Every structure is written in C-alpha cells, then in structure tokens.
UniProtKB/Swiss-Prot annotation:
Residues binding Mn(2+) 2, per UniProt: E80, D108
Keyword Nucleotide-binding: no
Keywords associated with the record: Cap snatching, Endonuclease, Eukaryotic host gene expression shutoff by virus, Eukaryotic host transcription shutoff by virus, Host cytoplasm, Host gene expression shutoff by virus, Host nucleus, Host-virus interaction, Hydrolase, Inhibition of host RNA polymerase II by virus, Manganese, Metal-binding, Nuclease, Phosphoprotein
Residues involved in Mn(2+) 1 binding: H41, E80, D108, E119, I120
Encoding gene per record: PA
Protein name: Polymerase acidic protein
Presence of keyword Repeat: no
C-alpha cells in the first residue's frame, strides 16, 4: 500500500500527509491505510479548489489555462494541509475580516463567494452515515459539509453542492480510479474495511437546574459556558505533536519547539548566602544515646522509668554552661530549662512511687521557650471586618542560603551500618496469601540489608517521638509535659537495648485543625562540638553539660558532652506522617523490587536470590562530581532507604516543588540519553520554576547539586 500511495499521488501531497501523520505520532509505514486516506482527502480538497477564481466583479469563474495577468482571486482558501498553528492563524484572520463565526474544529476550505467554511469528507462507507457523523461532530450551522464516496455518490448540506457539475465529476472520476487501482493490486478490501467512523453519535444530554449552575461555576478559566468547554474537549486530539496540541489549547499560544541537545542544558543556579543550617526535628548523626542493655527494671517500657534508668548510667554530669548561644534567643532561659529538667527528675526519684508522666512547672523560662501567651489574640472576623486598614502581616522573604557540606555528611552517615538491629523481620508485615513466597524472600533479603542501617534508626526514632508527642498533645493539652526521646534496638548478640537521646517539653496543644502548631523545646545529648560548624547550629543554643569517658584504641579518653537545645514546632498532620515513617522501608523495597523485576524479565526467571547473593556485582547508586558512584546491592538498598527517610525528615514545600519541576528536566535529559531527540519550549520557564524552589533548604540544595552532577555526566 505504501508503494502504491507514493506512485499514485503527487509528491507534494505525499509529503503533506507524512507531515500530518508525524504531527500525531503516527507512522505512514505502519498505518498505510490511514496514509492512503489522508492523501486522498488532501487531493480532493485541492481538486475542489483548482481552477475556481473570483473576478473583479466578484463573480465566480472557472479558468483552466487563461490569461495569467487577469486580476483573479482564488475562490477557495485551502486550510487542510497546513500545520495546525498556521491553519488556525488563517481561520482567525478569515473570521476577523469577514465576521463569520469561528468554527470549533479546523475546516478544510473557505469559500469566498458563499462566505462559509467547508468540511470535505471522503468515505468508503455510506455517504449518509458519514454525513451524519460529520454534522454531529462539528455541531455548527455555519460550516458547510460536502461528502464524496468512492462509488460516485455525494451528499452536501441542504443539497447545495457549491461547485458546478463538471468539477464534481472530475473529483468522482479520480476517486473511482483510485478505487480501481487499489482493487487491481488487492488493496481495496483492507482499505475499505479500515475506515473508522467519526466520534460516535451521542444523544444530546441536557443538564438543567442546580447541576447546570454548578457546572457553569466549575468550568476551568477562559471558558464562558459548558457548551464552549464541551466543544473544546470533543475537539481535543489526545496524542500527537506538541505544537498541534498547543494551537488546539489556545489560539494565542505559539510555542516554538527548540531541539534539546547535549549543549542545551545549563547547571541549576544554587543560591548564594550564608551556609544553610540544620532544620530536622531531632539530631541525626550528632545524636548521642545513653543506653541500658537487657532492661529489667521495675516499670520497664514506661518511658519516664526507662529515661530515669538511662540517665543513671551516666556519672559525668557537671554544672552546665553555654558554649554556643542562639543568636536571637534569650540564652539563659535555655540554660534554666535544662536545670529545671534535672531538678524535676531528681524530685521524681525522691517520691515513693514514680509517676507515669511528668508535667513540668510552668516557669518563666519554659513559658518563654514554648511561646506561651505569645500568639496574637484571635478575634472573630465578624467583629473586625469593618476595620478599614485590616491586612495580613507583612512577612519577610526567606533569606537565601548556600549549600553546606554538612548535609552530604549527614546523608553519607544515614547510609552507614550501625552495630545494632533496628527492625525485626516482621516490621514490614506478615504474608497474607500463599503466592507471597517470592515476596517474603525479597522482603527478608531486603530487611537483612537495612536492619542495621542508621536510616532505619532514624525511622524508629521518628516514629517514637512523633507518636509520643501526638499522644501527649491530645491527652495533656494544657500541660508542659516532659517526653523522653527513646528508641529500642537489639545488639549484634540479640540483647535488647533501650536508648535515651534527650527530652522534649511540649507546650500548650489545643490542636483543632491538622495544621495547628504545637510548640516544643528539644534537649538532645551530643558529643559534637558546635564550634566546629557553627552555621549548622544557627537555630540551637548549645550547653556543655558533662564529660564522658570513651574507650578508644589508646585507652580511655574524656570528651565533653553537649546538650543541643532549641525551640521547635510541629502539627497534627506532620506528626501523623512522622508516625508512619516505616513507609520509607516499603517505598525503598518497592524500588529495589522493580530493579529485580527488570533483571528477571531479561533472564526470564526470578532473579531474587542471585540479585542479593552475588556479592561481586556492583550497581549504580548515584552521581557525584567524580562520576557515577557504584556499590553493592546492600549499599543500593541503604542509599534508597536513606533518600526516602530524608524526604520524610526534611519534607517541605521547597522539596515538593523541586521534585516535581526537576523531574521534567530529568525526563528530557533521559530522553536525550536514549536518542529520542527531545524538543522543548520555554526551557527558561522550567529552569525558573526549579530554581525558585532553591532557597535555603539543606536537603533541596543537596539534591540540586546532585542533579547538576547528573546533568554534567549524563550529557557528556
């Protein structure tokens, strides 16, 4: 069929048809019947217009080879065969100059004599059927329809055939010839059967009353009525060339598609400014634990009892002093708050029976740290809507921060192995169905790779802290409750261990809405000297509270112990997500699973065992300035887990925006790597959208710098 088309039709027509198909992502070599149909339709449109002119007196005349100098104007404007943007431009200018109503779909011709658009149809079926489908699709009184068939029949709106008998006969003869040529080559039957109807004829379904009003209210912008929107949706072709899509979406849009080459992308611009600071809800790599092994004390499992027991394992407490003040805070209050915690814990121990929870005295330092009475008084809107200068608070633009090296160190640390086991095998949930055998095997392998990982410790710590804080926020709304920060794990030998990281004191927590904030003060133990990277600890006041003896290869050394204190806040919805951090295990397991699936489909057998047990194989982990980093399958599991955990710990609007927008650029770059010749429009706008998310968030800035490494290496 393809050869027939190329022999049978004028090369210009063939070229236009190929272009039209390409615009809709169709291949003339594969969809040969469609190729033939498009060429036929184009040829009929050109024949319809050929030799028809309008003379100086605006009379319609037919000239086949007359005086080339006569002042003649073509009677028909050909719209079919132009690219969509150009075609709409022509339609728009005709409507503007003649005042004819603008059609909803691109017609084929415009008749300057009758002042109307014409839709030409060529059908291999019954002309009446095709005519009805066309009329139903374009739903316009203004556009004239003229249908031809390969059997010499025709049908036109109001039986007005526009052209003289002879011109129409020429078209019918040509169609008959094409049919015979196809039949003689054995192509006709397949061509005849391949014709698909226009959109099915739908009943007119009227919406009235309330539903109609709701429909009119909920239209997207720029649509005046439901009909107007419906026509747009009906006429929208769902696949094909992007220029065509854009010109369909809006007649005003004129996008130029630029090729995306290796030299096209530039690196993302990271912001300048002071280095970014730590903003997680609890310390990560800098946290220090006071631990008890094999806990068996009275009240074991009650957080306050566990905390007091852990505190007693340390003997190096000393008079606290401030070593790194908080720039904006009242630092003596932080110091007093810690002293108050120590004193009140001491009081508990002096009581006969230790209580299950501890509410702190509402001292001035805690009231200050927890922002008590700081919130502006809420006034009912009804009472103040007449105030003339009512306005929202002016809020400052966030200050730009530059990427600091500490966040990469944090990430590296999160990927490392610890010497404790943080999740039991059943943490991901038991099998339900018998088919789950392979899934269980994968889960067990994966769990073995990540159970010792520091990111898993962060998950369990996050789950514990958020659960405890949400519980306290609901159970003791008005109290300044003391909440120990605890985690539980097992040693390599399988012994149970309870760890204390520090304490939280929660403020008033009348949380009605998901986003209502509860303030808290966190006090966390650490051996990290804050003076080494003061920019990281901008939001903290750091005290030195003791000396710890550490065993090293050269014997025991004494190191100062610090307490990192800061005011922080969270909300019900954030705590809910924090409680569900175990989902990170599932997310990274699914990513690993898709890698195994890809491998298995190549080898045509389940590759789970080989995947995890072949220790010699390395896998790509990520990009760094040095190039693609590779590592063992365990390292891949832990890296994916750490990414998922950091997305949770450092969740923010900046991260949401960056992930969504940078993904577009990533897909374009991937397409270039796969030699798919991607094209783009408004690449500058995409860069702008990505870069407006690069403000001051450490995790987003790190991801942006990784993205730059990827761009540099991917497109070499």
């Amino acid at each position: 069929m393809e050869d027939f088309v190329r022999q049978c039709f004028n090369p210009m027509i063939v070229e236009l048809a190929e272009k039209a198909m390409k615009e809709y992502g169709e291949d003339p070599k594969i969809e040969t019947n469609k190729f033939a149909a498009i060429c036929t339709h184009l040829e009929v449109c050109f024949m319809y217009s050929d030799f028809h002119f309008i003379d100086e007196r605006s009379e319609s005349i037919i000239v086949e080879s007359g005086d080339p100098n006569a002042l003649l104007k073509h009677r028909f404007e050909i719209i079919e065969g132009r690219d969509r943007t150009m075609a709409w431009t022509v339609v728009n200018s005709i409507c503007n100059t003649t005042g004819v109503e603008k059609p909803k779909f691109l017609p084929d011709l415009y008749d300057y004599k009758e002042n109307r658009f014409i839709e030409i149809g060529v059908t291999r079926r019954e002309v009446h059927t095709y005519y009805l489908e066309k009329a139903n699709k374009i739903k316009s009184e203004e556009t004239h329809i003229h249908i031809f068939s390969f059997t010499g029949e025709e049908m036109a709106t109001k039986a007005d055939y526009t052209l003289d008998e002879e011109s129409r006969a020429r078209i019918k003869t040509r169609l008959f010839t094409i049919r015979q040529e196809m039949a003689s080559r054995g192509l006709w039957d397949s061509f005849r059967q391949s014709e698909r109807g226009e959109e099915t004829i739908e009943e007119k379904f009227e919406i009235t009353g309330t539903m109609r009003r709701l429909a009119d209210q909920s239209l997207p912008p720029n649509f005046s009525s439901l009909e107007n929107f419906r026509a747009y949706v009906d006429g929208f072709e769902p696949n094909g060339c992007i220029e065509g899509k854009l010109s369909q979406m809006s007649k005003e849009v004129n996008a130029r598609i630029e090729p995306f080459l290796k030299t096209t992308p530039r690196p993302l611009r990271l912001p300048d400014g002071p280095p970014c600071s730590q903003r997680s809800k609890f310390l990560l790599m800098d946290a220090l634990k006071l631990s008890i092994e094999d806990p068996s004390h009275e009240g074991e499992g009650i957080p306050l009892y566990d905390a007091i027991k852990c505190m007693k394992t340390f003997f190096g407490w000393k008079e606290p002093n401030i070593v790194k003040p908080h720039e904006k805070g009242i630092n003596p209050n932080y110091l007093l708050a810690w002293k108050q915690v120590l004193a009140e814990l001491q009081d508990i121990e002096n009581e006969e029976k230790i209580p299950k929870t501890k509410n702190m005295k509402k001292t001035s330092q805690l009231k200050w740290a927890l922002g008590e009475n700081m919130a502006p008084e809420k006034v009912d809107f009804e009472d103040c809507k007449d105030v003339s200068d009512l306005r929202q608070y002016d809020s400052d633009e966030p200050e730009s921060r530059s990427l600091a090296s500490w966040i990469q160190s944090e990430f590296n640390k999160a990927c490392e192995l610890t010497d404790s086991i943080w999740i039991e095998l059943d943490e991901i949930g038991e099998d339900v169905a018998p088919i789950e055998h392979i899934a269980s095997m994968r889960r067990n392998y994966f769990t073995a790779e990540v159970s010792h990982c520091r990111a898993t410790e962060y998950i369990m710590k996050g789950v514990y802290i958020n659960t405890a804080l949400l519980n306290a926020s609901c159970a003791a709304m008005d109290d300044f409750q003391l909440i120990p920060m605890i985690s539980k794990c097992r040693t390599k030998e399988g012994r149970r261990k309870t760890n204390l990281y520090g304490f939280i004191i929660k403020g008033r927590s009348h949380l009605r809405n998901d986003t209502d904030v509860v303030n808290f003060v966190s006090m966390e133990f650490s051996l990290t000297d804050p003076r080494l990277e003061p920019h990281k600890w901008e939001k903290y006041c750091v005290l030195e509270i003791g000396d710890m003896l550490l065993r090293t290869a050269v014997g025991q050394v004494s190191r100062p112990m610090f307490l990192y204190v800061r005011t922080n806040g969270t909300s019900k919805i954030k705590m809910k997500w924090g409680m569900e951090m175990r989902r990170c295990l599932l997310q990274s397991l699914q990513q690993i699973e898709s890698m195994i699936e890809a491998e298995s489909s190549v080898k045509e057998k389940d590759m789970t065992k080989e995947f995890f047990e072949n220790k010699s194989e390395t896998w790509p982990i990520g990009e760094s300035p040095k190039g693609v980093e590779e590592g063992s399958i365990g390292k891949v599991c832990r890296t994916l887990l750490a990414k998922s955990v950091f997305n949770s710990l450092y969740a923010s609007p900046q991260l949401e925006g960056f992930s969504a927008e940078s993904r577009k650029l990533l897909l374009i770059a991937q397409a270039l790597r796969d030699n798919l010749e991607p094209g783009t429009f408004d690449l500058g706008g995409l860069y702008e959208a990505i870069e407006e998310c690069l403000i001051n968030d450490p995790w987003v800035l790190l991801n942006a710098s990784w993205f730059n490494s990827f761009l540099a290496h991917a497109l070499k």
